[in-house]
């Protein structure tokens, strides 16, 4: 279903753009438009269906999935395909443009005006989702409304929902919907794919934040330099008004140096930023199963609090979120006050180091982290709270950077007392080959390593052998709503399977 925007007569909307029309026998001046979408399955009668060239196929090839729409916006290649392949148009107006992206932005801004909402964005390899949700939670605690664009809680039927950053039309629509609901802010994750492919349109962020950069998406960027340059683009050419940069990594330091010294910087390591007037110092400490943190502002104001999420990274991401809010003009004393009154930040992020446990069952952790760095972070956190054995379930995505699979096997083998290698989003790769590549990374005796293709069976097997003081870590899948196999998105919930496994454990079967 397409999110509805501001209604226009199609003829009036066309006058405000430079699109060129093909000859159409039907009259369309009285047609109304109230939505724009690039997803064929969600097109409704009053929508413009946007059919441009995708990564592997052209959008007009999906016209047979469109039941009815106000018009089709395409490019010259799309028109050629329709003419040569005689694809059905059902007398629908066809709008042809020589400038697909720029015209799409003009249309999206008209139908989904977003000029009166303050937008901030977060980029980096790891920590985008949690930092965004933490920032939104802190705003909520202060009585300030914040819309978010997120993959958390999405369903298999939402075709773009598992994109870190939605397609351009969907992003504008979500921001507009938040604005209509009287949200004061909107937070988004800015993936390197979205930055490269123009999915952010001409949105200018009030604050852009950088978390970190570790190897990922090498199938897209080919090397780390290209990956870094994609991220860096968010901080250049007036794409953002201010910046917050984590300088605990070499790429963070480089980004700070290459984009000017006006950014706020945050670090655990004082030697990196003490001379900078906008330096924020963060430190983290273990508090039971959660983590406490101390954040010292450039003026010396000290915030001491904690977050209920498991893992040091979430405490550091909370510090990052606080700095972002301060850059948005939120008073640090106000943030400190709500944290003190609440006794820290208490929240759950589905699929992000999410803990499941009932009675005397083993602790089961479900985590979305699938990069080498994120998986190691999860392993360290899980190991640190485990009195018994750490039992790990790992998978790796098909058609996504195969070079990391051996490293995943090496890490999981080193930290785990028992390892199950299973299948995830194999896509069009042979899942057995993916498992073999992970297994190749496991060093030493492999008697504690088992391959179980079915993720459900792997979960049941892990819980069956676990004792009450053991931890089962399900790493790499999180709250994804489906399994992507051979072009089909099969509805699936790892979290539900974990719940069933724990119910079975409680029943002793």
Swiss-Prot record:
Domain of life: Bacteria
Entry protein name: UDP-N-acetylmuramyl-tripeptide synthetase
Name of the gene this protein is made from: murE
Keyword Cell division: yes
Function of the protein: Catalyzes the addition of an amino acid to the nucleotide precursor UDP-N-acetylmuramoyl-L-alanyl-D-glutamate (UMAG) in the biosynthesis of bacterial cell-wall peptidoglycan.
Record: residues binding ATP: 124-130
Family under the similarity heading: Belongs to the MurCDEF family. MurE subfamily.
UniProt-annotated binding residues for UDP-N-acetyl-alpha-D-muramoyl-L-alanyl-D-glutamate: 164-165, 191, 199
A GO cellular-component term linked to this record: cytoplasm
Post-translational modification: Carboxylation is probably crucial for Mg(2+) binding and, consequently, for the gamma-phosphate positioning of ATP.
Organism whose genome encodes this protein: Tropheryma whipplei (strain TW08/27) (Whipple's bacillus)
Residue numbers bearing the N6-carboxylysine modification: 231
Keywords in alphabetical order: ATP-binding, Cell cycle, Cell division, Cell shape, Cell wall biogenesis/degradation, Cytoplasm, Ligase, Nucleotide-binding, Peptidoglycan synthesis
Pathway it works in: Cell wall biogenesis; peptidoglycan biosynthesis
